A protein has these predicted regions:
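Cofactor-/ligand-binding subdomain signature composed of acidic, glycine-rich
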Residues: 1-34
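Short, contiguous strand/loop micro-motifs
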Residues: 10, 139-140, 173-175
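Cofactor-binding active-site loop characterized by glycine-rich and histidine/acidic residues
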Residues: 21-24, 29-159
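Thiamine diphosphate
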Residues: 159, 164-180
Length: 180
């Protein structure tokens, strides 16, 4: 690997981690009063994938999970708009209506999560099937237990769609633990 690739990934991941730490502080001080879904500890997957996409000049459709701050920032989302979104401001990335859960930006092709666990797998699969554009879908380990996510994986395989599924194993799944 080239040195600048590794440094670029490190820089993206560091920005994401610092952002998450600052959000946590602001929530603790009640400066952010809306619910937030932090992704600290999960920043290297989106940082690495975003850097690969940048180097390969791929502008994928991105379907993030509810812990999407690092995804948004890694793929070039506007940090100021994200801060404003977390505060419910109209000039936030989702006009203050999506909050932490549903980060959306057509500028970076990122489509907000709707709140149903794993539903972004189905929505992203449909978007890819329709557009035939490279697509990245981020889900958590708990979402991988949902039947409709498994159906999406099957459909992607059958139709040979250009989709990368990224599963964040944060050990939050309640039905299937790693030990099993």
């Amino acid at each position: 690997m080239k040195k600048n690739f590794i440094l670029n990934v490190f820089e993206k991941a560091s920005i994401c981690r610092h952002f998450e730490n600052e959000v946590f502080k602001r929530v603790s001080k009640k400066e952010i009063t809306f619910p937030v879904y932090l992704s600290a500890g999960q920043e290297y997957a989106p940082a690495t994938i975003a850097e690969i996409a940048l180097k390969k000049r791929i502008k994928p459709l991105i379907f993030g999970q509810h812990r999407g701050h690092s995804i948004y920032l890694s793929f070039g989302g506007n940090i100021i708009k994200l801060i404003k979104e977390l505060k419910g401001k109209k000039d936030g990335c989702t006009h203050g209506m999506g909050g932490s859960l549903s980060i959306h930006s057509t500028k970076i092709n990122m489509y907000g999560h709707d709140g149903f666990m794993g539903s972004n797998a189905c929505i992203g699969t449909g978007a890819c099937f329709s557009s035939k554009k490279p697509t990245i879908i981020f889900i958590g380990d708990a979402a991988l237990e949902e039947d409709y996510v498994l159906a999406s994986l099957s459909w992607v395989s059958k139709k040979e769609l250009p989709i990368l599924f990224v599963v964040d194993d944060n050990n939050y799944a309640v039905l299937t633990k790693k030990a099993e």
